[in-house]
């Protein structure tokens, strides 16, 4: 399916999401959605809506797989933790640059509040709702991995490329 077709389809399908979205969610569901929104923002904030959706879909595909943690936050935060911080300060701090999702352990502040009134944040929230409610439509053909198109990670030779959406290349 071509990207333009996917974008049109996703746009049309998204129009129905608010009708299906539950106004009441549990605290745990809210936490998981926040992890998803944060990951989409920091991994794909500069991408078009379909690119944000694709990154979120990779996370959701990992949650469904038995090869990864079974929660959104578990998938997003997967990686080794700094044992010194855990032992001395009783804090879970990721080892820098060793995470599955680079924003989580790049040493930069990951505050979402400065994005609160932007179109980017609204797109992220829309993608999060879409993925939480209508998660049976794929724009990545089942991808569980992706990378920016300006890098060439060693792991990509072991996977099959499914699609490229703007600056991200997706694999399964």
Segments (PLM) and residue ranges:
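Gram-negative bacterial Sec-dependent N-terminal signal peptides
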Residues: 9-14
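N-terminal signal peptide c-region/cleavage motif recognized by signal peptidases
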Residues: 16-18
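Bacterial extracytoplasmic/cell-wall-associated proteins, especially those involved in peptidoglycan
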Residues: 20-172
